[in-house]
Amino acid sequence: MSRIFGTDGVRGLANGLLTAELAMELSQAAAIVLGHRHAPEGQRPTAVVARDGRASGEFIGAAVTAGLASSGVDVYDAGVLPTPAAAYLVGDIDADFGVMISASHNPAPDNGIKFLAHGGKKLPDAVEDTIQQVYEAKDFVRPTGAEVGRVTRLSDAEDRYILHLVGAIPHRLDGLSIVLDCANGAASGASPDAFRDAGATVHVIGAEPDGLNINDGVGSTHLGPLKQAVRELGADLGIAHDGDADRCLAVDHTGTEVDGDQIMCILAVAMKEAGRLNQDTLVATVMSNLGLQLALDEAGITLVRASVGDRYVLESMVANGYNLGGEQSGHVIMADYATTGDGLLTGLMLASRVAQTGMPLQELARTMTRMPQVMINVKNVDKAAAKTSEPVLEAVARTEERLGAEGRVLLRPSGTEPVVRVMVEAATHEDARREAEQLVSAVEEHLSLQS
């Protein structure tokens, strides 16, 4: 059987790939791998289960809970919550593991299952592979009588999380007017409450979830409504989440987007000033803009680049003791307070920096100037040879030499298709386009699969 787990758990069409049967049996397997193999003898393991509000989350959540409880795991049902809230609760109540039911920024018909290790951390690939092996073997445990798991509603789950968030920010938000776009998702209740508790005047859009409208024309993948609301209301800034609120993008008072790279730059500078940025280092990915590198160099901050995916950012952070990292898409990990990307925490910290400095977000964002970027997908090519083909590597080297310190080149093979993504950043858009097209020609000439 091919690997069930993708880059962020199991994800697909609910009742298509992701059936109730699959959800229950994966949970039975996780009960063994994450629960019984670690819990003290004679003690039932515990797990937190949460979901993001999609209609399908109700039956998938029921299947997950059934799989866990029937395997002798005590379940704390946290209801509809952001992914980072579920991760926080796993650590807060010292559960053995957690399960988040969400498809993040995907449309409503999709759903997903993400297992969280003890402490709320994402699972390494090897542990996911072990869960799949147990799932395929169908060698589940089936306790009876007093050994079956019990299900408890965690009624104060959201309140615990909000208290944690508000307690983390270094400066209150009194006097700030903020528009929140909750993507009709899991943060529709928690985010407005957290920002209000922190002192902000809050206006909310995209906070009327009906199970079918998550990410539908709102949220971090659709910033138009937020930009319009900020301008019309004369707000200081806007914050957008995705469906499970593990990411955050922002707009300034003019409605101009502030992306994940800019947010990380603002937070890194703030943390360095406060003496709280471990080793004066930020972890981003190979996709982060060269402008971030240049701005951090100016601020005396080291940029470490990881592979694309917040899990790889986190792996680098944990391995080296760094405490700030993230992606251009708005996944920002602040390891002093969270084990995963947290859109609410990120938004609160960003707003706190605005309040602390008295500077508009527009001015803070100018710390970093985004370099013009051109990305072209080259199809039907031998993606495996992209990093070994001598003519292609020579073309890349020539491009890098021409661009010098004011440009950057990245050839990134697709994980699922015979495609190589050619990305070039340069001082001008025209330079980036010209150099990218030359590289595309080299890739097509030397890596084409067509006979």
Swiss-Prot record:
Cofactor note: Binds 1 Mg(2+) ion per subunit.
Record keywords: Isomerase, Magnesium, Metal-binding, Phosphoprotein
Chain's gene name: glmM
A single cellular component GO annotation: cytosol
Catalytic activity: alpha-D-glucosamine 1-phosphate = D-glucosamine 6-phosphate
Residues modified as Phosphoserine: S104
Name of the featured protein: Phosphoglucosamine mutase
Changes after translation: Activated by phosphorylation.
Cystine connections: none
InterPro entries: A-D-PHexomutase_a/b/a-I, A-D-PHexomutase_a/b/a-I/II/III, A-D-PHexomutase_a/b/a-II, A-D-PHexomutase_a/b/a-III, A-D-PHexomutase_C, A-D-PHexomutase_C_sf, A-D-PHexomutase_CS, Alpha-D-phosphohexomutase_SF
Family membership noted in the UniProt record: Belongs to the phosphohexose mutase family.
Organism: Kocuria rhizophila (strain ATCC 9341 / DSM 348 / NBRC 103217 / DC2201)
Recorded GO MF terms: magnesium ion binding; phosphoglucosamine mutase activity; phosphomannomutase activity
Residues at which Mg(2+) binds: S104, D242, D244, D246
UniProt-listed Enzyme Commission number(s): 5.4.2.10
One GO-annotated biological process of the protein: carbohydrate metabolic process
PANTHER family: PHOSPHOGLUCOMUTASE (ALPHA-D-GLUCOSE-1,6-BISPHOSPHATE-DEPENDENT), PHOSPHOHEXOSE MUTASE
Positions of the catalytic residues: S104
Free-text function comment from the UniProt entry: Catalyzes the conversion of glucosamine-6-phosphate to glucosamine-1-phosphate.
A family per Pfam: PGM_PMM_II
Cofactor: Mg(2+)
Gene3D superfamilies attached to this UniProt entry: Alpha-D-Glucose-1,6-Bisphosphate, subunit A, domain 3 (3.40.120.10), Alpha-D-phosphohexomutase, C-terminal domain (3.30.310.50)
